[in-house]
Amino acid sequence: MSLNPRDVVIVDFGRTPMGRSKGGMHRNTRAEDMSAHLISKLLERNNKVDPAEVEDVIWGCVNQTLEQGWNIARMASLLTQIPHTSAAQTVSRLCGSSMSALHTAAQAIMTNNGDVFVIGGVEHMGHVSMMHGVDPNPHMSLHAAKASGMMGLTAEMLGKMHGITREQQDAFGLRSHQLAHKATLEGKFKDEIIPMQGYDENGFLRVFDYDETIRPDTTLESLAALKPAFNPKGGTVTAGTSSQITDGASCMIVMSAQRAQDLGIQPLAVIRSMAVAGVDPAIMGYGPVPATQKALKRAGLSISDIDFFELNEAFAAQALPVLKDLKVLDKMNEKVNLHGGAIALGHPFGCSGARISGTLLNVMKQNGGTFGVSTMCIGLGQGIATVFERV
């Protein structure tokens, strides 16, 4: 494949094991320490990359307060081998934060404003809860439906609009756990999980190299027994068909194709296009549809050209309508989230965009795909998408 000098390539990807937010492996690890460990280990793994060449560390994080405040990108960077001469910024696009971090780095590379970037994101939802310090504007209900800030209810709405049944959602939730468990047993996550020290359920310090969030004993019967989590009267969305509240971080090294060539690095993939889109906040989960359509148009591709998709599983009631309208629902088992998704692995807000993109690249590498799309919905009505081509 012929690459242009300013094409944006992904050199490597790594993530922490996903930990439960309540009493999980990361309960005694701060968000910036988790991030710094990941950055350091990924740079060690890629010793052709000089940390002094890093132009900017761009880190996604949603709730930027407490240990995640005061520009956590810089806080984490200062704890690594990256010198003080490199810059750092923290970005938030809610759920899409670390994919936005990737896009920001890509746009800088494309416009000759840097060659080497470290991007990623973190959310320690056990230490900084999603609602900590949130103060919604009381006038918002004049501009959007009152429940638009309640993500579970927007998923209920989207599922109802598209005729998604409780049974379909339960089957999707089961699939996520089964595929994530299968991927774990087969070593499919080995290249992406950077082992970390953490504490087990008995309080002992140990090294974790697997996700503690996956529930291999999940069954359709156990899912069917769960009560609706958001709408007690007639609701269909449950805790078992929603993304888990977890702690985690993800990281990528990205650079210009020219710099990768100069360093003798074989990249994983090249970014072919990027897009963001807005939708009605009341159906925020629909955002991946227009975002993906935009990105495909910019890449000159059609949906049938895409070999694999990673769609963030915010809710089964949200994911299924998206797959339906992208015309890939009937190909889900061959193309979509082949290693499970956020229902099994969790959705640490600032982490997820880079996480699903990196998992996609590994799926493409393991299965020989050429084109892939990572996409996700974003609270309050947005979508974000990235089209990758394997190099």
UniProtKB/Swiss-Prot annotation:
Its main location: cytoplasm. The keyword Transferase applies. Catalyzes the final step of fatty acid oxidation in which acetyl-CoA is released and the CoA ester of a fatty acid two carbons shorter is formed. Heterotetramer of two alpha chains (FadB) and two beta chains (FadA). Pathway: Lipid metabolism; fatty acid beta-oxidation. Belongs to the thiolase-like superfamily. Thiolase family. PROSITE patterns: THIOLASE_1, THIOLASE_2, THIOLASE_3. Its EC number is 2.3.1.16. The gene is fadA. It comes from the Bacteria. Pfam families: Thiolase_C, Thiolase_N. GO terms for molecular function: acetyl-CoA C-acyltransferase activity. Keywords: Acyltransferase, Cytoplasm, Fatty acid metabolism, Lipid degradation, Lipid metabolism, Transferase. The keyword Cytoplasm applies. GO terms for biological process: fatty acid beta-oxidation; phenylacetate catabolic process. GO terms for cellular component: cytoplasm. It is found in: Cytoplasm. This is 3-ketoacyl-CoA thiolase. InterPro entries: FadA (IPR012805), Thiolase (IPR002155), Thiolase-like (IPR016039), Thiolase-like_sf_Thiolase (IPR050215), Thiolase_acyl_enz_int_AS (IPR020615), Thiolase_AS (IPR020610), Thiolase_C (IPR020617), Thiolase_CS (IPR020613). It catalyses: an acyl-CoA + acetyl-CoA = a 3-oxoacyl-CoA + CoA. The active site is at C95 (acyl-thioester intermediate), H347 (proton acceptor), C377 (proton acceptor). Gene3D superfamilies: 3.40.47.10.
